[in-house]
Amino acid sequence: YAQHLVQQQVSSGDAVYVHLPRSLSLYLVLLAAWKAQKVYVPLDPTLPLDRLRYMIQIVGSGTIVTTDEYEHMIDVSLPRLLLRQLEEPCSERPFTYEPSLRVPAYILFTSGSTGKPKGVQISHRALAAAIKSWKIMLPYTQQSRLLQLASPGFDVSLFELCLPLSLGFAMATAPKDILLTDLEAAFRALRITMADLPAALAALVHPEHLPPMEWLMSGGDMVDERVVREWGTPPQKLINAYGPTEGTIGNTLG
C-alpha cells in the first residue's frame, strides 16, 4: 500500500484522502499513508458531499483513496487510487522508511457547530506524546480488547486504533449498524474489556451484562448519573475524558 502511495509523485506531507467506511482496509491505508510520510485525511462516506468538497478545498493537493463503489461520489480533480490498485503487486523496489516526528500525522475537521468546520493539523510528535500519556494513565494488559466504534472523522477513532497498536493488545470492531442494534451483545461477542463511548451510548451498557471490563471511558457530553453510579463503583472504573480536536486526543482524563 505504502509503495503505491509513494509512486504518486507527491511530496512528503501531502494529503492522502481516505474515502472509505470503517473497515480493515481503512486502517491499512491509514498506516500506509504514515509509512509513506503522507498526511491522513479521512473522508467519511456518510457525510454530505458538500462537506467533503469543502474539506478537500481547505486541505488542498493530495491523492484520494477510495473504492469502485465510492469513486464517483466526489467530483474533484485530484489523483485517485482505488483500493484494489493498492492491493496489486508493486514493481518498484521497496523504499526506505525514515520516520519523522516533524511530519504532520493527520488533519481532522471540527464539527462546525459555531460556524464553518475548521481543519486541524496534528503532528506525529503530538500524537506520540498523547500515546505516551495514555500508556501511563490507562490500565491495560496484553489480553485487553478495545472497541473501535467512532467514525473515522472523529479523533476518538485514532485513539481506538493507536492505543492497541502502540501498546500491544487487540482492537475489535464490527459494522456500526450491528454494534448499535445490541451494544451489550456486541461487547460479549467481541469480548470487549475497554471502550470509549459517547454519553448517550454509555447509558445503554450495564457492567453486570458485560464481560469483565477494565474501564469505560466517556466524554463530549454530560454523563448520566446512573452511569456514574454503576461504573464509578469498584471494581468498575469510569473515566471521564475531554479534549478539543486542536489538542490532539483526550487532553484530560479523570
Predicted feature locations:
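Carrier-protein-dependent adenylate-forming modules in NRPS/ANL systems
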Residues: 1-128, 138-139, 168
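Conserved coil-to-alpha-helix start sites within the AMP-binding
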Residues: 20-31, 46-50, 149-167, 181, ...
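Short acidic active-site motifs
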Residues: 50-51, 179-183, 226-227
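Alpha-helix capping/helix-boundary segments
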Residues: 47, 69-71, 178, 200-202, ...
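Conserved acidic residues
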Residues: 53, 62, 144, 193, ...
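Gly/Ser/Thr-rich phosphate-binding loop
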Residues: 166-171, 193-196, 202-254
